């Protein structure tokens, strides 16, 4: 009976990863995080801000209208009699109003700034896409770690039951007079150690669940363990992932920022050119004076030009800003390429780790079963049994973490290559 109980415990440990009802799919957390994660919300607000700034720049080179009005109470009114009738120069109660339409005719610097602002807004759109991919990476990391911690809790619980069964076996051997009290003490100490392992596993599970909830805005359902499996297939060649480097949202956003900085530098040079604007004003007043008309209009063409030391210094400043943007673009491009390479190599290493960990898990579980059977008949010491059980537990923990790291590495590779996890990936569950 005791041997059968131990075998059942080992079977539960070995086959915990078989398909079963589980917590919500990764897509649920990813979709929510893309809209509710603070980083995604910040990037989305940044896009709205840049679009508004683009409209501000455009508005400065488009026709505009302004109006003003005033009421004046004069202490003394002034009236002049010109023979044909009195002319009010300064009334006691004076009302004035005017409206002016301004039309920029030539503003090369303003037009260039409009183009730069539009480029910056476009870059912000790609920055939002990049931020969402980064959010997905965080969610995937938390999700698969949660599954690993969930599995570790199950394994720790199984190990505790196995340890308790070993304690009962030691107590029976002591009662039969074939084992010393030392074996019971060792078995009891092992039970307490496994209890501590289970408490630590529960803590990690709770922390992982909270981290996933904070990143995604969705509370994970922890009622049933989730499956974690990978078929150990190799990924396509590294070149297939690096081929889309220039289309990655982060790279496109950095390139757009560089182009916008260059356009701003060009706009600063255009500021050396004069600007020309036309105005048309309509004025109404209760004090027309000698004109004799309450309403008058005025049309004008205005010419503006200025030059001083700040003009040259501003050009140099904008040129330096463009150089900074180019350096940042290069850094982003290199970092993106390195991230793809790192994740691709991580997947390759994780496949080897997972394959080895699975084989080690099976061997360690078999060794633990043999040690249990041999300890029952007294052919090995209790220390041998405890060591075999600890080795089996360590092997199972290593297998769980290796599988979780592998599945996560595949997800991180696709994200590094600019592919959202909302697109299903073959071979990964």
Task: Mark where each language-model region is.
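Acidic, low-complexity, intrinsically disordered peripheral segments
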Residues: 75, 398-429
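Bacterial N-terminal signal peptides that target proteins for export
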Residues: 1-8
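A small-residue-enriched
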Residues: 28-105, 127, 137, 214, ...
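A short glycine-centered flexible hinge/capping loop motif at secondary-structure junctions
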Residues: 174-178, 375-379, 416
